Amino acid sequence: MQSEAGAAGAVHGSLQSGALTTTYTASQGLLLMIPNMYKMAGELLPGVFHVSARALAASSLSIFGDHQDVMATRQTGFALLAESGVQEVMDLSAVAHLSAIKGRVPFINFFDGFRTSHEIQKIELWLMMIWLN
């Protein structure tokens, strides 16, 4: 793919064919995906975008956490789900996927773009198993 715009097009096509599809991106990439996000939400395709939310900058060198990238997608029709820690990211990622499938609504699952995305922490898998049962 040349950019995240192409990746969003690939996700859209994959979802249309019935595959369970997700992608992971950060601030500038998310803004390039917005045109395809309108299509996915309008077609009620159950995709999930995991977003490492960072401040938008002229270059891609910003390490400051900010939600302006995610807030730019509010009007697309995607449901938003926010996490504040590594355990929450693990648990609510599964919730986002299950909710997208059950409700036929695409989700943006977002968290802090520098602290949480680079944090190393032991997680409890049994918490995620509760959601799957």
Q: Across the structure, where does each feature detected by a protein language model lie?
A:
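Conformationally flexible catalytic loops at phosphate/diphosphate-handling active centers
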Residues: 107-133
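Thiamine diphosphate
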Residues: 1-72, 78-101
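Metal-ion/cofactor- or nucleotide/acyl-coenzyme-handling active-site neighborhoods
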Residues: 70-74, 121-124
